[in-house]
């Protein structure tokens, strides 16, 4: 069978996670319209009788403002090493500028063959897409093809998957056929909660939040009890997350619980607590150990 690892590279908010979800035909990765939603490297496994593709979703490559951002970029760049193929993704509407050139440099340095992906083509005209294609072909030294996609409309994703499979080697099956990610339930829960915070809050709030699952335990009545802490930088942010009379934390909790119940196939009691850890985004221990960046850089 055809098997291999396929890393995604691109600046924040080009639709890398949405693209993977569209290709595998289910929501595995959290998504939002805000940049830097993805913080960790996540393997998404797509298996059939003929192939197993392991998509390595990565944080957007950007110039960081905090230590957290530095580790995110390290995780993204390290993911480009040792894979069989790279999908270099750009946003058709944003075009190609300095941030894209920054990404292209890292991709070229990896010496790994790449497929250029022009995503969000539904937002621009054909002429602009053709111009972007020519630039990508010129700037990406190991580019084997360019594919035009719209992840939200599921356009071009089948063509992209076919091209990926065509360029993967014959090899062993790395993961069981029913496995869709190598991340544990605690990680998936923290990501779902964080996605809801991204959805319901604005400006700096989503980026100032870390979600750490402290306990997962099945109770005697069969309900899965999950306790998680939501960490923020400042007391004012804590007040926004909790909301007037607890309305915001209730909304976040209800929406997250519904998705977690779908994930585990059973009833869930989600116990959320909001705590302040000042300047946590610049503290190495929290970033490396509690958020798991240490493993992302080593993988």
Curated annotation (Swiss-Prot):
Domain of life: Bacteria
Pfam families referenced in this protein's UniProt entry, alphabetically: KH_2, MMR_HSR1
Topology of the protein relative to the lipid bilayer: Peripheral membrane protein
An individual GO BP term: ribosomal small subunit assembly
Domain KH type-2: 201-278
InterPro entries the UniProt entry points to: G_ERA_dom (IPR030388), GTP-bd (IPR006073), GTPase_Era-like (IPR005662), KH_dom-like_a/b (IPR015946), KH_dom_type_2 (IPR004044), KH_sf_prok-type (IPR009019), P-loop_NTPase (IPR027417), Small_GTP-bd (IPR005225)
Gene3D superfamilies associated with the record: 3.30.300.20, P-loop containing nucleotide triphosphate hydrolases
Location of the region described as G3 in the Swiss-Prot/TrEMBL record: 57-60
GO MF entries: GTP binding; GTPase activity; ribosomal small subunit binding; small ribosomal subunit rRNA binding
Disulfide bonds: none
Binding site for GTP: 10-17, 57-61, 119-122
Region listing for G5, in residue ranges: 149-151
Location in the cell: Cytoplasm; Cell inner membrane
GO cellular component: cytosol; plasma membrane
Residue ranges, annotated region (G1): 10-17
Every Era-type G domain range: 2-170
Principal location class: cytoplasm
Segments of this protein annotated with the region G2: 36-40
Family: Belongs to the TRAFAC class TrmE-Era-EngA-EngB-Septin-like GTPase superfamily. Era GTPase family.
Function as written in the Swiss-Prot or TrEMBL entry: An essential GTPase that binds both GDP and GTP, with rapid nucleotide exchange. Plays a role in 16S rRNA processing and 30S ribosomal subunit biogenesis and possibly also in cell cycle regulation and energy metabolism.
Name the record gives this protein: GTPase Era
Source organism of this protein record: Thermosipho melanesiensis (strain DSM 12029 / CIP 104789 / BI429)
